[in-house]
Amino acid sequence: NKYGTMALSVGLSLYLGWFVPLGVALYWIVSNLFAILQTAVLNRVIDPKKYVDYEALEASRKRLHEIEALQPDRHSAAAKENARREKADYKRFFSIENKHLVFYSEKSGFYKYFKDIIDYIVTHSNVAVHYVTNDPEDQIFEVAKRQPQIHPYYIGQKKTITLFMKMDADVVVMTTPDLDNYYLKRSYVRKDIEYVYVPHGMASQILTIHKGGCDNFDTAFCAGQHHMDELREMEALYGTRKKTLVPTGYCLLDDLIADYESQPHEAHTRPVVLIAPSWQQDNLLDTCIDELIESLLQADCRVVVRPHPEYVKRFKAQAAALKERWAHVDTERLSMEMDFTSNVTIFTADTVVTDWSGIAYEFSFATLKKTLYIDTPMKVSNPDFPQCKTPPFDLDIRKRIGVCLKPEEAGEAGATVRRMLAEAPQSEAELRRIREESVFNVGHAGEVGGRYLLKQLVARAQNAKE
């Protein structure tokens, strides 16, 4: 009977249609309940507290939450607009063939390390400068409006990973170390790209860069002889291939010197002391800042506290607490500076107090004034540095361009600053001599770097013709 068969078929289908989902649901419910029971039993047998540091785990969770809170809302109108820009710029970047020169920057603040080099290139050639940045608000977009040779692209950090994998250019210039060690890889498309590392500071390469951080670059610009010596020693230590080392100098220092010398300088009736620490663990803000401020105020100094931008961003509570603790002091004697866009405070200070921040070199070499160092625990990115025979520049230079105090000696800061200022006239000539010894091509770093890049591009063009 066809109707009976149809009814049986429909009935069986309905039965299975209900039975199978219910069976699967029952399976998952029972298996999950059993897994919970199994975990509870195992936790009683093997106590996880013996193997897991729950306090550290909770601290890491809080830290992760703080970092995530710093990220922009992906669903905001601005984020959606940036996503649209990124997609368009990514497509535009790869639509251009025969790119010769590419600069990569993580954020707007890194433009200052490239500025003089790029200025030389666009002034002395018609080479197009392709500038990739992870910062949608990078100043390069405004610069490019005035200079048509510069072609800027906003590419987010994640998309930069694939951009680097597919990179097609003759020369790539960047300040980011650890090329090919982490997420930024050498091109999978072209094997003949020359990758050039530009240091964003005069600090020691064997201290501040991870082991192997420069190994995968073809060329490294060097601020001073210490960079060349340290890089060569690391090559020998690790048995890596020799890079081309270019004695360029330090572009940012050149700009700071020019800016400082172009400004009028008035003597202060009350010495101005700028406290500008790093943001590493156990920096002077977290170890001896109150004793430091108290001592300087007692010595009748005007104190300006300028925390590192990363410290303010990551440790808002500590920065706010510091500000509140000293709110009772008149701002004519003590002020907290949270605007990091200007160098006016650096230029007008009579001395700088820091721990391991590179601002010391920039201040002392630009103004020819001594720095007061607080010897907080040193930040070491490369634990192998004791194996190097070359003494780290950061350790050697401190006592030459400044005076060092231990954190427990912070109460002596006021008297120390007064003594340093009394000796300032004799210190200027000595600091000028040390600057000339320590930094290559003072006043001409951008020219030297730009000339090298143009020379490499010309050589490649000639080889291509042949």
Predicted segments with their positions:
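Active-site and donor-binding regions of nucleotide-sugar-utilizing enzymes
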Residues: 102-257
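Conserved catalytic-core segment of nucleotide-activated headgroup transferases in glycan assembly
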Residues: 109-126, 251-325, 407-410, 421-422, ...
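Short acidic-hydrophobic, aromatic-tinged amphipathic segments that line or gate anion-handling sites
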Residues: 151-157, 248, 334-338, 401-411
